[in-house]
């Protein structure tokens, strides 16, 4: 591919296109990948479709002002994002250790973007072009639009609008608002006069002209009073709906952050149009010498079938970004993309995914949403399925069958996650059976996250009984179709509400499973999530009940170690945790014990542990007692398990 297949990145590109001045310049923290899994590509192509000229400055050197000047001054303004991930999440682990890789950068190496990229980029643009309008968007801006707890500072920060000095913030899915804002700028309206576009947030000196709004506790209040913080979050959480949501206002000293109600979800026709735009579908050629961009590997042969999620997991911020209403593409649109993939020179016959945030949420949760919006005080699938929930996999199954029939397609995988409780609510097992037959390869990754019902309740996840029923059914189906396929559960330690007792309960469950997870995710308090609010305040903002928070680093290490109790280096922490919790009954050589009395020799541990794990599997796995399963295959399949992102 040549540079002409991409949006312009240099003066040479502008000259070839006979462009003197660009209308917009997108500055992004990711490398430039022209694929619909990347927000920069979507916004750039949407604006191009509307007749605007758009250039890309990807990962500029923030210590060199000339990098921000290389495409000149845009006619209408700069559009700034940190990339597909919040820059702080991208740079640091849950234990605040610096990451050494970055899948969104050349060669997968870190160091191509600054911490708090949106703020840094905006400040540099203001330095280069003082009067040029700046619009910020993407996940980092979207989830930091109000005063928010910042895990890395361990304090409440102001709205990112205040810290970045940007003129306007677009939150959530940006296609509709960016088109409306850009057209207003084209018609001659000044950026500081654009105040009525849904899906935008701006700063105002006074709010006398506003009508029908809710003022939430101010920055000064939420930064000094945790009850006020919880109250502010609760209001934000309930008002993120395009039909019933109101304008929200939060005072920051003498000014106000004003969030307009969300944009309506994209229609199916609009979704189809977005994904039919002329993407190059790969990274820019300038990265070839550096090894390309690793992030393209997971998405190049994957298909986004829909956006949004009504699962409402507490630790996920999708409610604030993509919303609870499903926005899907038509089958024709998806089939065209699948057919197009088969003609790509490096296509090997495998489509890696057909899904979204939750693969089997292909349609809206209920018909009520279409007229009245999402329910304010009720979730669709938690704590149990709403009576209005439409449980049906028929359309999704029909789509998958059609893709399987496309010439040169050998296999269609589902990797974006299956909501197992929704799957269990479906009385028709046809989808479940074909999922096991055609759409997984040896193992299915699912996310029970925990096993303690009190923790699951705070996570917004289904109870242990639901997961147990799913596991049994999964293995029953695999037995019927004569397949030796396994489950790889995602598990999380140190989530709000998880004390040592709950962690030990999960460790005992893992013992009965018969193998130790190779990767365990510590709870990560990222901006915008309900769980992060619990973590900071010690309060569940939706119920106002107090929540136990494992903040002590020693206890967090204990909880993590308990989930991998057979690892030699975890022995001392596990023993200390069991003694602290008065569970010495789990220390010894009995069948239910997690660790022996004495620390094993490290050299022989791996061999002995593998043997012990297999014995536990044969004796204690209630779901698989009579199945002829190769233990070697099981261990091999688990070794492929990658860390959750």
Swiss-Prot record:
UniProt entry tagged with the keyword Iron-sulfur: yes
Q: Which SMART domains match?
A: Elp3 (SM00729)
Source organism superkingdom: Bacteria
- CC cofactor: [4Fe-4S] cluster
Biased composition range(s): Basic residues: 600-609, 632-645
Which residue ranges does the record annotate as region Disordered?
Answer: 598-645
The note on cofactor binding and number reads: Binds 1 [4Fe-4S] cluster. The cluster is coordinated with 3 cysteines and an exchangeable S-adenosyl-L-methionine.
Any GO MF annotation of the entry: iron ion binding
Entry keywords, A to Z:
4Fe-4S, Iron, Iron-sulfur, Metal-binding, S-adenosyl-L-methionine
Low complexity composition bias: which ranges?
610-624
Annotated [4Fe-4S] cluster binding sites: 309, 313, 316
> Which Pfam families does this UniProt record tie to the protein?
DUF3362, Radical_SAM, Radical_SAM_N
- Domain Radical SAM core, first and last residues per copy: 295-566
SUPFAM superfamilies per record: Radical SAM enzymes (SSF102114)
Q: What does the sequence similarity comment in the record state about its family? A: Belongs to the UPF0313 family.
Q: Which HAMAP family match?
A: UPF0313
- Please report the name of this protein according to its UniProt entry: UPF0313 protein CLI_0267
Give the source species: Clostridium botulinum (strain Langeland / NCTC 10281 / Type F)
